[in-house]
């Protein structure tokens, strides 16, 4: 079996590739990336004879499809703005797929994947991904489900990669239609910083105000739990306090609209400029506490009694006391490992459903 790690030079996808090297039976693990120097650096870091590098530009569909056709599955770590193109390439190439974001562009390719007898699972990192499994674990123990609240703390620098910078701008876009809650059978659009709720995360992360965010779990959980009468689904998140302070100020002052401004003879989106600055500034590349913590609450009934499940997640300390989990790797490994596990499960034939499948049905 051969796997193509698309965007494999990225900080998160390389961790998924590392997990495949450590635990999978793939005969070939190809790092596919536009950035050749970073990609070859990952190959050297992984130091395994099964690993090679192929340069690929997802915007070049013909080239990308040809490369994908040489592989059984694509583990897609590209940015959310590229997921439409990358999924289209997988569908045409006739290979299995999985990605991190799951924001919705992938589902329009369902028929193509079904026709080719292939499976694609969008949104399988930490959030969405592991959170979907936590909701499913709790809900499957209940006869009816009334409330689902998914919350997370992503403790990472605000702009350590292009993908993360893009995600930050996307999630707090004031006009984003996908920032919704599910309430009494309807998806209701809400503004940034809507419905604040204090969430107590596992140590060392503590209690933080969290706000509604545009994540796939709202829609996938609604689909999975439709037969159990679910009335409310809310997905919240937070970043380090300094990050949230900055995003709130940018939102209050209108920067998050990303209006075009003229600088000299050049016109640029103001958030695009701020994002580029943060990617080059030390303040955008570091944070005080690293890692990822999840908190999932599911309320329902069993045997005629009302019950509540609260599930949490954490990981080895990021302070250097545990090798391989130092600082940023405590965050990136948390996101990469679930995608690697999902990749192995799909490639090994454990997922019988074909088409583009939500995580709750796939796993």
Across the structure, where does each feature detected by a protein language model lie?
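N-terminal Rossmann NAD(P)H-binding glycine-rich loop of SDR-like oxidoreductase domains
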Residues: 5-19
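N-terminal Rossmann-like NAD(P) cofactor-binding module of classical short-chain dehydrogenase/reductase
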Residues: 68, 72-77, 97-99
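Helix N-cap at the beta1-alpha1 junction of Rossmann-like dinucleotide-binding domains, i.e.
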Residues: 10, 35-37
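C-terminal catalytic/substrate-binding lobe primarily of soluble NAD(P)-dependent oxidoreductases
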Residues: 141-363
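Conserved Rossmann-fold cofactor-binding substructure of NAD(P)-dependent oxidoreductases
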Residues: 57-70
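ADP-ribose/adenylate-binding Rossmann-like module
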Residues: 89-107
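Rossmann-fold cofactor-recognition segment
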Residues: 46-60
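Rossmann-fold NAD(P)-binding glycine/threonine-rich loop
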Residues: 101-120
């Amino acid at each position: 079996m051969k796997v193509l790690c698309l965007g494999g030079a990225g900080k998160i996808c390389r961790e998924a590739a590392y997990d495949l090297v450590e635990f999978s039976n793939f005969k070939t693990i190809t790092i596919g990336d536009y950035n050749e120097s970073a990609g070859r650096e990952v190959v050297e870091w992984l130091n395994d004879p099964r690993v090679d590098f192929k340069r690929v530009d997802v915007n070049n569909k013909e080239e990308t499809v040809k490369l994908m056709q040489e592989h059984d599955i694509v583990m897609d770590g590209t940015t959310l703005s590229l997921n439409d193109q990358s999924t289209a390439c997988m569908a045409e190439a006739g290979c299995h797929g999985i990605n991190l974001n799951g924001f919705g562009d992938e589902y329009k390719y369902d028929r193509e994947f079904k026709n080719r007898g292939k499976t694609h699972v969008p949104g399988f990192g930490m959030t969405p991904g592991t959170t979907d499994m936590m909701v499913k674990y709790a809900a499957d123990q209940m006869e009816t489900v009334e409330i689902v609240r998914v919350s997370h703390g992503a403790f990472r620098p605000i702009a350590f990669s292009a993908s993360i910078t893009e995600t930050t701008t996307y999630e707090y876009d004031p006009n984003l239609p996908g920032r919704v809650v599910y309430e009494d059978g309807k998806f209701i659009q809400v503004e940034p910083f809507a419905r604040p709720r204090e969430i107590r995360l596992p140590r060392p992360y503590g209690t933080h105000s969290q706000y509604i965010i545009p994540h796939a779990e709202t829609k996938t959980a609604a689909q999975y739990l439709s037969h159990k009468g679910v009335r409310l689904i809310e997905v919240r998140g937070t970043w380090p306090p300094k990050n949230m302070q900055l995003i709130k100020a940018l939102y209050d002052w209108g920067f998050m609209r990303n209006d075009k401004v003229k600088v000299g003879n050049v016109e640029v989106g103001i958030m695009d400029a701020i994002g580029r600055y943060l990617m080059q500034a030390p303040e955008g590349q570091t944070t005080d506490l690293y890692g990822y913590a999840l908190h999932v609450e599911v309320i329902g009934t069993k045997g005629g009694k009302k019950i509540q499940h609260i599930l949490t997640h954490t990981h080895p300390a990021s302070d250097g006391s545990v090798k391989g989990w130092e600082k940023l790797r405590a965050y990136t490994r948390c996101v990469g490992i679930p995608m690697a596990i999902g990749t192995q499960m799909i490639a090994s034939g454990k997922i019988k459903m074909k088409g583009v499948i939500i995580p709750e049905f796939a796993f």
